[in-house]
């Protein structure tokens, strides 16, 4: 399945919640009609079965992190192999992706922009260039914007936008040097309350 290249607002409207796919320059309700689904009959949302709710939750999280189904399923398999709560581990794996960490540190306005920055070799991990968006960042790793990329206007704008976001306890960022350290594993309590990971686990465990 190809990656979706259409309007970002349409995806958020489909899920009925902000997926943080846009920069946040304007309030989301100014850009998207969040109270209605896309399409001619969007004003009337269909009542979903339990299975339908599970599918929607999977789609929502996949779209939020910009991941295709095959790769998303691999994250579930890996999470189920590890000790502890499978749902929390799944979110930890998603949050530990390099493109997401770059976004969380405020070096990009969206996860899609962060992915592009990584692919174009604008990011270093522990002093070495890494162009793999799905690379797992571990506690103690230092993520930095490469010198040649620091003057990009989009990065400077992203840093300004990030000042209005809630600070996360598991990362430490120096906005002057444009580098940050992942201090610990992502904390589930600081992630979106709109995510119900248990529905995803129920879907895949059938």
Curated annotation (Swiss-Prot):
Q: Which residues does the UniProt record annotate as the domain S4 RNA-binding?
A: 96-158
Pfam families, from UniProt? Answer: Ribosomal_S4, S4
State a single Gene Ontology molecular function: structural constituent of ribosome
Q: Which UniProt keywords apply?
A: Ribonucleoprotein, Ribosomal protein, RNA-binding, rRNA-binding
SMART domains reported for this sequence: Ribosomal_S4 (SM01390), S4 (SM00363)
Where does it sit, as one GO cellular component term? small ribosomal subunit
Name of the protein: Small ribosomal subunit protein uS4
Biological role stated in the UniProt entry: One of the primary rRNA binding proteins, it binds directly to 16S rRNA where it nucleates assembly of the body of the 30S subunit.
CDD domains annotated for this entry?
S4
Similarity comment text for this entry: Belongs to the universal ribosomal protein uS4 family.
Subunit comment: Part of the 30S ribosomal subunit. Contacts protein S5. The interaction surface between S4 and S5 is involved in control of translational fidelity.
Its Gene Ontology biological processes? ribosomal small subunit biogenesis; translation
Query: Would I find RNA-binding among this entry's keywords?
Result: yes
Report if keyword Ribonucleoprotein is assigned: yes
